[in-house]
Amino acid sequence: MKVLKFAAIAVLFALIPVIYFSFFADETESSTKKRVIALGDSLTYGYGDKKEEGYIGRLEEKVNQQHTKRSYHFQNLGIPGQQSDQLLAQIVKPDVAEDLSEADVFIINIGTNDLIKNNGGDLFPLHHDEIMDAKKDFLDHLDKTLNIVGTANKDADIIVLGLYNPYPDKDSDKIEAYVDDWNKSMMKEVKKHENVKYVSTNPLFKGKSKENYFHDSLHPNGKGYELIADRIMKNYDF
């Protein structure tokens, strides 16, 4: 019995360094490898960029160029045409929920389709009642999305991008007023949640030529997505 006892103790002591170094290796890997998940619509997806990178691909490149001792992997889950209720349905799917639990940073860009589609598919003319009803539903969906994402990983940061006026070179004061209203409401919602940062995108295209920064009436081209990527870099410390 004594021989067996001594043998068991010897095995236990032999395993201690293995367990320690295994734990240390896992901790080191988690500190040097970071995962970023992007959620949203065609803007997150990067529609309109000839390089098919959008602002997410460009941001990943910029972040990894900045960090030499830490690597960032970006996972783009953006779906063209997606509205906030559809995003809610997406993030509760088992495979997506599993991904969310492993993320260190989330980037959410949603709401453009809620605004445009509920106005009839474009922004000309504007329908006040429909837009205000859509905003109410959107904010409810955003609140639930932030709760779900925040619960998936309580240590992760969440970046929420504001909306922009897609007609910066037109006489679009009325559109601008609604975009500002939605953005202000988004900022108020963001403040209710922990580890969530709001990043404005509306100033990016003001005073700039539509044909130089847009692929079509709504989506940026490569230069436009570059502006968004730079904006995030300036407002969030990866």
Regions found by a protein language model. Give the residues of each.
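Surface-exposed cleft-lining segments at the edges of enzyme active sites
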Residues: 79-84, 115, 122-138, 170-173
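Serine-esterase "nucleophile elbow" of acetyl-processing enzymes
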Residues: 24-80, 95-98
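Oxyanion-hole/transition-state-stabilizing segment in secreted/luminal serine hydrolases
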Residues: 89-133
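Structural recognition of the beta-strand scaffold that forms the well-ordered cores
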Residues: 36-38, 73-78, 104-109, 157-162, ...
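Histidine-centered active-site loop/cap adjacent to the catalytic His
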Residues: 215-238
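Substrate-gating cap/lid alpha-helix
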Residues: 166-201
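Hydrophobic membrane-insertion alpha-helices, especially the h-region
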Residues: 7-20
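Active-site segments of SGNH/GDSL-like serine hydrolases
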Residues: 146-179
